[in-house]
């Protein structure tokens, strides 16, 4: 955050999300500062500038590890090293280890894909029809689709759900050892 604060001349917190070994920052404030008239919707331009910005920030952080290691850990040599992994066009953060992001560059390789961690849509215990709907809704949200259009899709799904196959809308779980309960007296009997 100190790099951002020094460059932008403020004391704002620009960190979006932290995890055990990851930090997520928006590079948009830095790109806006360096290119005030830039078209921020131009994916190619933004990816290029974000990768350049990430490299500068990465070098800044890695150099600061020398001071950190000496001052706080009293060691001269260390193995701390940070690197930029992906560029996300948009993201949806719920809580720690639960998010979805639309990645347009992964490790320097151009891509265009949804990356989801911890949300129900990636869990095998989530009903298939709901997984399909919620994946579509997440893609639409990250793709900046109009809210009314998303609402229409949800209402259409709700209407179609009444005639859907139970296998698609029920939880995909089973009951083990069903015979174990065959001779049990029902509760309340």
Predicted segments, located by residue:
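DNA-dependent DNA polymerase catalytic subunits
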Residues: 1-20, 27-189
